[in-house]
């Protein structure tokens, strides 16, 4: 990863933050994106290589072409795009406002594919690149109280499995990561059925693996060029 440019969304905390610090320790240039610029600055201070902070809201997709241009102006290439940003949900389907379903699809699906489509021409011109999308076990199996989240993650998987087949001829690799329970703030930041913050750390999340362990599993999977990368405890076996 020496001198490679790696763009990570959702980089202000959790898995994204751990990935940024890990890849920096391996010599990569790091582009940090999320909505929280203050937290991104803290992450940048923990990176030992060149960084670029690009504040990004996955719901504001019109900003993505300009953001991509800024990355290319700074680092010339985009070698890896890690689609990690997103939001979860904790509510029964019958108690979830349709606006919440739409918002999760807007951020997790449309936001992710819009940024990918902004970056793809750069990788195509380079004739190389690797796109890694952090899905979830909920992208493989439906999960209690996560109907909207699972639907968006299933959509992600369908898109990126198709993209892998299309971009193989351009020497662009596509990997999908399926984390199990990782101790991050995803459940606290998840939306309730009304769209308010859930604000509670799930028991399974609390007992999950560390973001650092998950980041190492992802790095190993990328090095092995795996199409599917799994990380977690007994739930992934």
Residue ranges and their predicted role:
Residues 136:
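Residue(s) in the substrate-gating loop at a strand-loop-helix junction
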Residues 56-66, 98:
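The beta1-alpha1 cofactor-binding region of Rossmann-like NAD(H)/NADP(H)-dependent oxidoreductases
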Residues 169-233:
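SDR active-site lid
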Residues 12-13:
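Conserved glycine-rich cofactor-binding loop
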Residues 116, 152:
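Active-site helix of classical SDR
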Residues 26-43:
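Conserved glycine-rich Rossmann-like NAD(P)H-binding loop of the short-chain dehydrogenase/reductase
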Residues 92-103:
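Substrate-binding pocket helix/loop in short-chain dehydrogenase/reductase
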């Amino acid at each position: 990863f020496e001198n490679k440019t790696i763009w990570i969304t959702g980089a202000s905390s959790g898995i994204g933050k751990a990935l940024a610090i890990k890849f920096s320790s391996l010599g990569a240039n790091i582009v940090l994106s999320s909505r929280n610029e203050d937290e991104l600055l803290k992450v940048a201070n923990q990176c030992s290589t060149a960084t670029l902070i690009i504040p990004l809201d996955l719901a504001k997709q019109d900003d993505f072409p300009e953001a991509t241009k800024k990355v290319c102006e700074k680092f010339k290439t985009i070698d890896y795009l890690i689609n990690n940003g997103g939001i979860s949900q904790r509510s029964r389907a019958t108690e979830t406002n349709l606006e919440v379903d739409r918002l999760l699809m807007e951020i997790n699906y449309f936001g992710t594919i819009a940024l990918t489509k902004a970056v793809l021409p750069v990788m195509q011109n380079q004739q190389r690149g690797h796109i890694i999308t952090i899905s979830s076990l909920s992208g493989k199996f439906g999960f209690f109280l996560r109907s909207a989240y699972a639907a968006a993650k299933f959509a992600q998987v369908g898109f990126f499995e198709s993209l892998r087949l299309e971009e193989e001829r351009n020497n662009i690799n596509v990997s999908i990561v399926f984390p199990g329970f990782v101790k991050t703030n995803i459940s606290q930041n998840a939306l309730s059925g009304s769209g308010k913050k859930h604000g509670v750390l799930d028991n399974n999340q609390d007992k999950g693996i560390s973001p650092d362990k998950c980041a190492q599993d992802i790095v190993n999977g990328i090095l092995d060029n795996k199409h599917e990368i799994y990380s977690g405890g007994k739930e992934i076996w």
